[in-house]
Regions:
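Cysteine-centered motifs
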Residues: 9, 25, 45-47, 51
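N-terminal, Lys/Arg-enriched amphipathic/low-complexity engagement segments
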Residues: 60-110
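Short, structured beta-strand/loop micro-motifs enriched in basic residues and often containing a Trp
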Residues: 62-71, 112-119, 200-208
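Short, Lys/Arg- and Gly-enriched loop/turn segments at beta-strand edges
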Residues: 93-103, 140-150, 231-241, 330-332
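Intrinsically disordered, low-complexity linker/loop segments enriched in Gly/Pro
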Residues: 139-219, 224
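A hydrophobic, small-residue-rich beta->alpha segment in the mid-to-C-terminal subdomain
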Residues: 269-320
Length: 357
């Protein structure tokens, strides 16, 4: 006899008492119509045995506390083991302060010092400088209403728009903008680890991650971060129900969310910028205050990673990147004090080892 919860026994590193309950609920009771009543007890004993012989029982940690900067001096709000699944509950980038369309961002004394609250940080046991923190995005669930704003100073059309707040209803996976409905595609705007130097506010990106605003950092993606301090200090927030590349006016559909991730480590692997892995591509995320410098940062890192994986020299790798790799803009809402962020993507090469790992 088979029951739906079996995959949780086979694949999980650990089980909780809730998994046992779920598995028992999954049993097709019609299978017992012509069997001895002791079958039920047998199933329960089997589940108990499986749990007992798994690793130490852990219940998913739920992280709610947040900070406004990435800092090696931040006190961890939780500690996690590699392989553990964590849940982060996040505010929107305005700390949920824009309650109605009558509330304008210009009335908040808004600045990047108090923008983009990131839930965490979480100390990852065993993470040391020189390692890579691997974050698998398992799920991103958003609230039923989000916010778009213009502030009169940000983006290429700031002088062709007025300051405005627009509330966007989310219903059954669709956003409603003035009666135009389109599917949401939730993504995480701010995610990263602590830098080993000066603090970086959550609204800024850097080689630690931060406000990368990549619409590819969503459910199903795997993101790799350099570890520069003990414990890595992972934090995340600034979820968008949907956002276009470049985030033209400075916001996507900003929205509170619940994120589930799995964390793991790669020991002693050089990584200089965060990398996103999708089903078929690798993307280096890099930034600078102008396009040329951001492109150079991303190009150098992607070239290095491809060379390590293939054994090609610099020139062959440069040529290959020119014909098979694409530059895409994460955020470019200039003029804006936030640096330009881009991603440089290349297809996975089944003939060679992965770029990371």
């Amino acid at each position: 006899m088979q029951f739906a919860g079996w995959h949780r026994c086979k694949d999980a590193d650990w089980l909780t008492r809730y998994d046992v309950y779920d598995m028992l609920c999954d049993v097709d009771t019609t299978a017992f119509q012509h069997r001895d009543k002791h079958w039920s007890l047998s199933i329960f004993c089997l589940c108990f045995f499986l749990c007992k012989n798994q690793k130490k029982e852990r219940i998913m940690q739920i992280i709610k506390d947040y900070v406004y900067n990435f800092s090696k001096n931040s006190k961890p709000v939780a500690t996690a083991e590699p392989g553990e699944i964590l849940q982060f509950e996040t505010l929107d980038c305005f700390s949920n302060r824009l309650k109605t369309e009558k509330n304008l961002i210009t009335e908040l004394a808004y600045s990047y010092d108090v923008a983009n609250p990131a839930t965490g940080p979480v100390y990852i046991n065993g993470a040391e400088p020189g390692d890579v923190l691997v974050v698998d995005i398992l799920d991103v669930k958003v609230a039923d209403e989000g916010t778009i704003t213009t502030d009169g100073v940000c983006g290429p059309l700031f002088d062709h728009s007025e300051v405005r707040t627009k509330k966007i209803k989310i219903d059954n996976g669709f956003a409603d903008f003035n009666g135009v409905k389109f599917p949401i595609d939730p993504m995480i705007g701010v995610i990263g680890t602590a830098p080993d130097g000066e603090d970086v506010i959550d609204g800024y990106p850097g080689n630690h991650g931060g406000n990368m605003d990549s619409k590819l950092i969503k459910k199903g993606a795997r993101v790799y971060f350099p570890v520069r301090v003990d414990g890595a200090l992972l934090q995340m927030g600034d979820v968008h129900a949907t956002m276009g590349d470049a985030e033209l006016c400075g916001t996507g559909i900003e929205i509170p969310a619940v994120i589930q991730v799995k964390v793991s480590l790669i020991k002693n692997f050089e990584l200089n910028w965060p990398v996103t892995e999708t089903a078929d591509r690798w993307y280096v995320n890099a930034c600078a205050h102008n396009f040329d410098e951001a492109l150079k940062n991303a190009s150098l890192e992607l070239q290095r990673l491809i060379m390590n994986a293939t054994g090609w020299d610099e020139t062959d790798t440069y040529m290959y990147m020119s014909v098979q790799s694409d530059v895409e803009i994460n955020q470019a809402c200039v003029p804006c004090e936030v640096a330009m962020i881009l991603r440089f993507g290349t297809p996975k090469l089944p003939q060679f080892k992965p770029l990371i790992g």
